[in-house]
Each structure stands twice: as C-alpha cells, then as structure tokens.
UniProtKB/Swiss-Prot annotation:
GO terms for molecular function: DNA binding; sigma factor activity. The keyword Transcription applies. This is ECF RNA polymerase sigma factor SigL. Sigma factors are initiation factors that promote the attachment of RNA polymerase to specific initiation sites and are then released. Extracytoplasmic function (ECF) sigma factors are held in an inactive form by an anti-sigma factor until released by regulated intramembrane proteolysis. Over-expression of SigL induces 19-28 genes including polyketide synthases, secreted and membrane proteins. Might play a minor role in regulating SigB. PROSITE patterns: SIGMA70_ECF. It comes from Mycobacterium tuberculosis (strain ATCC 25618 / H37Rv). Gene3D superfamilies: 1.10.1740.10, Winged helix-like DNA-binding domain superfamily/Winged helix DNA-binding domain (1.10.10.10). Extracytoplasmic function (ECF) sigma factors are held in an inactive form by an anti-sigma factor until released by regulated intramembrane proteolysis (RIP). RIP occurs when an extracytoplasmic signal triggers a concerted proteolytic cascade to transmit information and elicit cellular responses. The membrane-spanning anti-sigma factor is first cut extracytoplasmically (site-1 protease, S1P), then within the membrane itself (site-2 protease, S2P, Rip1), while cytoplasmic proteases finish degrading the regulatory protein, liberating SigL.
C-alpha cells in the first residue's frame, strides 16, 4: 500500500511542478488566442489534464513538455472555434439570420497571425524592425539600411538572427510547421 501512495505522491509532485512551471505562460498564450480569461483558464486546466493522462510526454527529455502543452492548447482552441457551438455563439449572421461560418483555413490563419505577432513582440527592437521592413513591407536590404541608418551587411546579419530567434520562439510556442 505504501508503494501506491509513494507513486501517487510522486505523480502529484510531478503535476504540481508541471503546473508551477507552465500554467502562467500557458494561460497567457491561451488568453491571447481566445481573448477570454475564463476560457483561457479552461484551456489550461484541460491541457494539464491531458498532460496528466499522458505521462510519457512529460517524462520525455528529448522533447520539451512546453512545446507539447502549447500544441495541445492551440489544437483545443482551434477545435472549439471550429465547433458549431462557437460559431452560433460568436459568429455573425448574414441577412437571412443564418450564422456565417469560418472555414478551417480562416481560423488557422487568424491563430497563426496571433502566434506570429506574439513571437515578434518577443524579439529585440532591432530584429523586429528589420523583419517588419523586409517581410511585411517588402523592402530591399538597401532600403532597410538607408531607413535605419546602418550598413547593408548589418541588415543581412540582423535578418538572419531575427529569423532564427523567431523560429526558436515559435517552436517554444508549439508551432511545428
């Protein structure tokens, strides 16, 4: 009997550590995607419940638990947005009063924009400036260099490191594509 309670205590300690380490950042992520604090809390609780149901993921040292948690949370939010219940509650209506339905691609695109905006906000001001000018405005390296008053080589270097930092940030948020 002591063996079971010891295993249960170890499992409870593992879940507490998982909660302490990831719940706050997971909640902020879910809040950013949902725009609703209560729904974000529900997403966090359900995500941590799924983590508890899959202890092999938490114990896997090759793959960080945070990436798995963010992926689960994101998928739950996508599933909720795609559901008929969400479309009937939140969706707008056309002239006949029939709810307009978002396509899965529209939902994914909106969530991707939120994720990228969140990741961009975490970059340094210098990296964000070159990313915005290059990828969002379509400026050349020379135009960026002139606008920022830096050498073209510096622009290229900052772009390289900015894209690398953006990729790492998105991976931490659970983006795998």
């Amino acid at each position: 009997m002591a063996r079971v309670s010891g295993a249960a205590a170890a499992e409870a300690a593992l879940m507490r550590a998982l909660y302490d380490e990831h719940a706050a950042v997971l909640w902020r992520y879910a809040l950013r995607l949902t725009g609703d604090a209560a729904q974000a809390e529900d997403v966090v609780q359900e995500t941590l419940l799924r983590a508890w149901q899959h202890p092999e993921v938490i114990g896997d040292t090759a793959r960080p638990a945070r990436a798995w948690l963010f992926t689960v949370a994101r998928n739950m939010i996508i599933d909720e947005r795609r559901s008929a219940r969400f479309r009937n509650v939140v969706g707008s209506t056309d002239q006949s009063g029939t709810p307009e339905q978002s396509t899965p691609d529209e939902v994914n695109a909106a969530l991707d924009r939120l994720l990228i905006a969140d990741a961009l906000a975490q970059l340094s001001a210098e990296h964000r400036a070159v990313i915005q000018r290059s990828y969002y405005r379509g400026w050349s390296t020379a135009q960026i260099a002139t606008d920022l008053g830096i050498a073209e080589g510096t622009v290229k270097s900052r772009l390289h490191y900015a894209v690398r930092a953006l990729r790492l940030t998105l991976q931490e948020l659970g983006v795998t594509r």
